[in-house]
Regions:
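Short, charged/polar connector segments at secondary-structure boundaries
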Residues: 1-55, 59, 63-83, 87-98, ...
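Internal, conserved structured core segments that host functional sites
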Residues: 98-159
Length: 277
């Protein structure tokens, strides 16, 4: 992967009305972010969007955007990335469910109308997920595995997938993982009940879902975006009704040029662990 230059960073103030989320948010997390923003008085890191048909599909930062909307702001600072280019990688998070009795989980899932829970052979899970022939796979603690199936177009399926996740979200601990290998997960989460594994989405899926006003469950899509702009610390007053977007973006251009000129923009290509979010 080539090295990014600071001049390639695309930052812009845009209207919140033009920002289209593709995933659900968590009201509890939104409330927490509202408190943090009110306390700090600035937006630390801009949400990430892809520009499409004069709209902005939100790839990362749904909680921040929902918080700003709930606070009554008109605009938001975003970082715009090329969703069709090689620099953005769309992957998936799987959900580790902890503390919910497996029998209760299965019974509750069976009660979701229009969802089919079908037992499958353990050797077919990867194949089904890669081929995107299922909406999800359920891997129980004892190794029993099930396919989650439903009918309809992609927006219909997302509505049902959100209902599936609602069965356990808020009723058990839910942790994100990049794999569904049970032995190491049980070692990490001794009270693991099950793992819900999801197929990878395509960027075209995310765009279609956002444009149609549908939502993917929170914590499923995983966008890997090198060159994220962090630590801008833009005052919240810049998200308000005045001045115009043109004036805000002129101010932003001057700010970015000044920080580049003063060597205050640095690229860290190595992976890092963040403990304060």
């Amino acid at each position: 992967m080539r090295t990014l230059e600071p001049s390639e960073i695309r930052l812009s103030f845009v209207s919140l009305k033009k920002v289209l989320p593709h995933e659900e948010d968590d009201p509890v997390r939104v409330k927490r972010i509202v408190s943090a923003l009110s306390r700090d008085g600035f937006l630390r890191n801009p949400p990430i969007v892809a520009e499409y048909q004069s709209k902005y599909v939100l790839l990362d930062g749904a909680t921040r955007v929902s918080a700003l909307i709930s606070m009554g702001f008109r605009d938001v600072l975003v970082q715009i990335v090329d969703y069709s280019g090689e620099m953005v990688d769309l992957n998936v998070w799987h959900h580790v469910i902890v503390g919910l009795p497996p029998d209760q989980l299965l019974a509750n899932l069976a009660d979701v109308d229009e969802l089919t829970i079908q037992r499958i052979d353990a050797t077919t899970v990867n194949q089904l997920l890669v081929a995107r022939n299922v909406e999800a796979c359920l891997i129980m603690r004892n190794g029993t595995q099930f396919a989650v199936l439903c009918e309809g177009d992609i927006c219909d399926k997302m509505e049902l997938l959100c209902r599936l996740v609602a069965v356990y979200r808020g009723k058990a601990e839910v942790h994100r993982t990049t794999h569904f290998d049970l032995p190491p997960l049980i070692k990490q989460y001794p009270y693991l009940s099950a793992v819900v594994a999801f197929p990878v989405f395509l960027p075209s899926d995310v765009i279609q879902i956002a444009l149609n006003g549908s939502k993917i469950p929170m914590g499923v899509t995983r966008h890997l975006i090198p060159g994220r702009a962090l630590g801008l610390n833009i005052p919240l007053e810049k998200m308000g009704d005045t001045p115009s977007l043109e004036e805000k973006n002129a101010w932003l251009d001057d700010l970015v040029r000044q920080r580049i000129r003063m060597n205050k923009v640095r690229l860290y290509p190595e992976p890092v662990f963040v403990f304060d979010e």
